[in-house]
Amino acid sequence: MKNTIQDKTKLVNSVFSKVYKKYDLMNDIMSFGSHRIWKNKFLDWMNPQLNNTLIDVASGTGDIAKLFSKKTKNNSQITCVEPNKEMYSIGKNNLKNFDNIKWYRASAENLPFKENTFDFYTISYGIRNVSNINQALKEALRVLKPGGRFMCLEFSKVDNEILNKIYQKYSKIIPSLGKYIVGTSDPYEYLIKSINEFYSQEEFFDVICKNGFSQVEFRNLSNGISAIHSGWKI
């Protein structure tokens, strides 16, 4: 089990080290810009208030942190956590003008923060890349304040049969698209594989509940291409 976890950690790190320079561009192209709409809906449901504290895990290029800061008129304290060196550097540089945002390199399974610290914990398109999802959820629960909220945005299972057939066919061309734009298809073959192997909405709902969260619910976006899961620390 330990070797399997270590292998996945190395694989994921290698994937992001290959795509970091064109990460945002590929996201825009692959989703036809939809990922930006989904992220805004994510923040709308979150509805953060002034002076809230956020830990955003697997922050990538900093989209969620930036939207959270905008929602709170920059009157919030945001902690971005990113395990990959190259993604960390790009994200930190992207948000260098935000005095309320701090960056740390760490894994979702081992957060360097005290318990009961944050009002919100977010992870956007990152949870399926985590080597030990149960441990990551336990860490999320630990660092949230009582009454704090866990929110996850992730690719999920399409709930419309016709759309799903189109989606599956489109998914098969994404590695070729990646090779043309990034220069290698490997990261995008991993992307499609990781999406197909990840939990359904209902399965992930159960996993979140089993790791101690209360009032868990989810919402589908674009017929389940992506889904938002929410849970509370009570």
Language-model features: locations:
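N-terminal, positively charged/glycine-rich alpha-helical extensions of SAM-dependent methyltransferases
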Residues: 1-24, 170-171, 181
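A short glycine-rich, Lys/Arg-flanked "PGG" loop and its adjoining helix->strand segment in the class I
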Residues: 134-149
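A short acidic, Gly/Pro-enriched loop at the edge of an enzyme's catalytic core
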Residues: 109-121
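Core SAM-dependent methyltransferase catalytic element
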Residues: 211-234
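Class I SAM-dependent methyltransferase SAM/SAH-binding core
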Residues: 53-110
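Conserved alpha-helix/loop element of class I SAM-dependent methyltransferases that forms part
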Residues: 32-50, 67
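C-terminal alpha-helical "lid/dimerization" subdomain adjacent to the S-adenosyl-L-methionine
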Residues: 10-11, 81, 153-207, 211, ...
